[in-house]
Amino acid sequence: MSKDSSLHPKYQMASNIPRETSFLVPKEPTRYLPFQMCQSPLVTPTRPLQSSHSVHERDLHQKDSQEPSRNSGSMPLSDKYYNKQSGPVATRKCRKERTVYSKEQKCLLQEHFHQCQNPDLEQRKALALLIGVTEYKIQTWFKNRRAKECRKSSQLPRRIGSGPHYRPTSSSGGEVPDFAASPDSVCQRHVNVSYPPEFRPSRNSPHQEFNSSLIDQPLEDMCFSKSHIISEHPRQKCRELSREPGHLSSDRSGCSNVLSSPSPAAGAESSCDIPSGLSLSPQLGPPSMTQNSESTFSMCQTPSVLSPLPELSPLSNSLDQMAIFSKIDQVCEIYQKNTRSKKQRKETEKNTVQNLMHGQDSCEITESPKGTVSLPSSAY
């Protein structure tokens, strides 16, 4: 077997490679020997040194050959990088100048925007000729104006739903509310200001606390108004009865003053219990029929002149109302009985007068001589 075959297979091809020049060999090759011996422990001590020399020389040659190539490759990269760094400064795009419109031009654009927010090409060209700019700038202005309108419309609900905002204090020292606040908060402030302190709800308590003394008075007024409406029915009855012979003066409690003609039955019936404020007038004598009719008519026309309305205190309880209503009904029944007795008494008086007159006439006719007729006496 040849010497080459005794070598390790890893270094067989390395032995065939011709040796390179000696100027590439390092000055201190001995420091790599222990490492090479550890890599190939089965190799004889004479040949491995030569093979390791050759391998090491080849590796060093490859490293040296790669270093200049890397250095040469890095130079153009650095040049390119330098060009890239210096390029943007030199070739930077200039920013477009913003077109500034005058007041007249803005007014003209605003008028056209209110008429048509998205003009077509012909309208944009016409506007560009009028204003003196390009059609592209007109298109850009309309686009920005539409975006501004959309922004305003999107911000509108947020302003309405926001809470109350306050501006700095005014010269008088009070807070000036901002009109951008929500309507609920404005209404709440209006409620707190308009109501008196007794009716203003407390912020700490969930329920509203009111003064009971202020509530009782409206309740009493309401009860009195209901009683006044209910008591109109008996009052109307009394007014209808007052058209008949008799005197009546009405007030809030219904039938108050009854002026009756003299009769024994009326005196007995009038001795019934009559509530306070309801009194019978004294009997002044038997008036005639014409006087009765005139007096009743005048009382119906002007009841306040004959009997002024008394001032009644507000009712405090519904039981008092029921008691007053029952007393009013009793007085009305008494008045109806009095009127019925008056009618009956008048009818009996008429009958008696007629009977007496017929009796006197018959007596005078019988006593008078022949050829003479005596006239009946006039009724007193």
UniProtKB/Swiss-Prot annotation:
Entries under CDD domains matching the protein: homeodomain (cd00086)
Keyword annotations: Developmental protein, DNA-binding, Homeobox, Nucleus, Transcription, Transcription regulation
Stretches with biased composition (Low complexity): 260-271
GO molecular function: DNA binding
Highest taxon above the source species: Eukaryota
Region (Disordered): 1-25, 43-95, 152-182, 234-303, 339-380
GO BP, sorted A to Z: maternal-to-zygotic transition of gene expression; meiosis I/meiosis II transition; negative regulation of meiotic nuclear division; negative regulation of oocyte maturation; oocyte maturation; regulation of transcription by RNA polymerase II; stem cell differentiation
Effect of deleting the gene: No visible phenotype; mice are viable and fertile. Female mice lacking maternally transcribed Obox1, Obox2, Obox5, Obox7 as well as zygotically expressed Obox3 and Obox4 are infertile: embryos arrest at two-four cell stage due to impaired zygotic genome activation (ZGA).
NAD recorded as keyword: no
Tissue specificity statement from the Swiss-Prot or TrEMBL entry: Specifically expressed in early embryos.
Cellular compartments per GO CC: nucleus
Major localisation: nucleus
Localization terms from the record: Nucleus
InterPro entries: HD, Homeodomain-like_sf
Comp. bias intervals (Polar residues): 43-53, 278-302, 351-380
Record-linked Pfam families: Homeodomain
Task of the protein: Transcription factor required for zygotic genome activation (ZGA), a critical event in early embryonic development during which the developmental control passes from maternally provided mRNAs to the expression of the zygotic genome after fertilization. Cannot compensate for loss of other members of the Obox family, suggesting that its function differs from other Obox family members. May regulate expression of histone genes in embryonic stem cells. Also involved in completion of meiosis of oocytes during the meiosis-I/meiosis-II transition.
The family this protein is said to belong to: Belongs to the paired homeobox family. Obox subfamily.
Protein name (record): Oocyte-specific homeobox protein 4
Annotated source species: Mus musculus
